[in-house]
């Protein structure tokens, strides 16, 4: 069994990007600039945005945190989005989800300039991804593809079962794994919470990518020998013996499944760290695209 180490791989990627930023600086170019829009003060969102800003600083990007009150109206937020779209100093930005209930998330995501949509959620980028054109790929699926590539996991002709159909992970993964190339060229089954007899699918899978958010539901008797398992699930489970009062669990019963797997991601330290690294990679791509356009 080989561990797909997202922590180490994400650090490698950050170092590669940092070296490229140094080259851009040395040539007198403009370094990438990423902004994060945070509405309200949701604890998890604050932590996540904070780690994105910190990562930007570590690799030499410019970064801006746009902090807005929970009470902001939809129209005011749309006006801010328009402002960011028109800001020539900015290469890409993300709007941290979830947004307050009185704001229509779809309307906000649609208002983002696709050329600055480094989260890859705009329908234009999603469509370009499906058509195998250059696009911003959502950071978590992008990170999974990068792990598979760097660890040389064979995907061509393999049966991949994706569990979960969200537009953030499941659906893009089903598209990416079936695209031409490596990783890719896989036969994909997309399953979800309404799928009957899920184990019948997982038992026949060469690769399982699970993003359901149900702690440790994937057991050893649901997988075959030699399977590759990518665990995207992150759930806080109460644990009085832990100083924090909780532990982070993935969708996979790691202890049991790892004994049968050829490759497996841990939780934490697997897919999670890759997400921020690939957001930075998308931002670097946005800078290059803008530089090419301005020549």
UniProtKB/Swiss-Prot annotation:
Superkingdom: Bacteria
Name this protein carries in UniProt: Bifunctional protein FolD
Gene Ontology CC annotations of this record: cytosol
InterPro entries from the UniProt entry: Aminoacid_DH-like_N_sf, NAD(P)-bd_dom_sf, THF_DH/CycHdrlase, THF_DH/CycHdrlase_cat_dom, THF_DH/CycHdrlase_CS, THF_DH/CycHdrlase_NAD-bd_dom
Keyword vocabulary terms for this entry: Amino-acid biosynthesis, Histidine biosynthesis, Hydrolase, Methionine biosynthesis, Multifunctional enzyme, NADP, One-carbon metabolism, Oxidoreductase, Purine biosynthesis
Subunit details: Homodimer.
Protein's GO biological process: L-histidine biosynthetic process; methionine biosynthetic process; purine nucleotide biosynthetic process; tetrahydrofolate interconversion
Protein family according to the UniProt entry: Belongs to the tetrahydrofolate dehydrogenase/cyclohydrolase family.
EC number assigned by the record: 1.5.1.5, 3.5.4.9
HAMAP family: THF_DHG_CYH
Function in brief: Catalyzes the oxidation of 5,10-methylenetetrahydrofolate to 5,10-methenyltetrahydrofolate and then the hydrolysis of 5,10-methenyltetrahydrofolate to 10-formyltetrahydrofolate.
Gene Ontology terms for molecular function: methenyltetrahydrofolate cyclohydrolase activity; methylenetetrahydrofolate dehydrogenase (NADP+) activity
UniProt pathway: One-carbon metabolism; tetrahydrofolate interconversion
Positions that bind NADP(+): 164-166, 193, 234
Substrates-to-products reaction catalysed: (6R)-5,10-methylene-5,6,7,8-tetrahydrofolate + NADP(+) = (6R)-5,10-methenyltetrahydrofolate + NADPH; (6R)-5,10-methenyltetrahydrofolate + H2O = (6R)-10-formyltetrahydrofolate + H(+)
Family matches, as SUPFAM superfamilies: Aminoacid dehydrogenase-like, N-terminal domain (SSF53223), NAD(P)-binding Rossmann-fold domains (SSF51735)
């Amino acid at each position: 069994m080989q561990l797909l180490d997202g922590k180490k791989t994400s650090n490698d990627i950050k170092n590669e990007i940092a070296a490229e930023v140094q080259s851009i600086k040395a040539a007198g170019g403009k370094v990438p600039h990423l902004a994060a829009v945070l509405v309200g003060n949701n604890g998890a969102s604050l932590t996540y945005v904070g780690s994105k800003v910190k990562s930007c600083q570590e690799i030499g990007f410019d970064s801006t945190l746009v902090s807005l009150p929970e009470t902001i109206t939809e129209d005011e937020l749309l006006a801010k989005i328009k402002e960011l779209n028109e800001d020539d100093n900015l290469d890409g930005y993300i709007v941290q989800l979830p947004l307050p209930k009185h704001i229509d998330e779809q309307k906000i995501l649609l208002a983002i300039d696709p050329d600055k949509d480094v989260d890859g959620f705009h329908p234009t980028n999603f469509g370009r991804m499906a058509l195998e054109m250059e696009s911003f790929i959502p950071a978590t699926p992008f990170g999974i593809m990068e792990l598979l590539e760097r660890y040389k996991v064979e995907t061509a002709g393999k049966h991949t079962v994706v569990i979960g159909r969200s537009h953030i992970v499941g659906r893009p993964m089903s598209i990416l794994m079936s695209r031409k190339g490596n990783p890719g060229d896989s036969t994909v089954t997309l399953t979800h919470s309404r799928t009957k007899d899920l184990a019948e699918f997982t038992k026949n899978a060469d690769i399982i990518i699970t993003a359901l958010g149900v702690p440790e539901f994937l057991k050893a008797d649901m997988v075959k020998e030699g399977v590759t398992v990518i665990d995207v699930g992150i759930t806080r489970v109460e644990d009085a013996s832990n100083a924090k009062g909780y532990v982070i669990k993935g969708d996979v019963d790691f202890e049991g499944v790892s004994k049968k797997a050829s490759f497996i991601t841990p939780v934490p330290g697997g897919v999670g760290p890759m997400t921020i690294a690939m957001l930075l990679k998308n931002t670097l791509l946005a800078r290059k695209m803008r530089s090419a356009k301005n020549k």
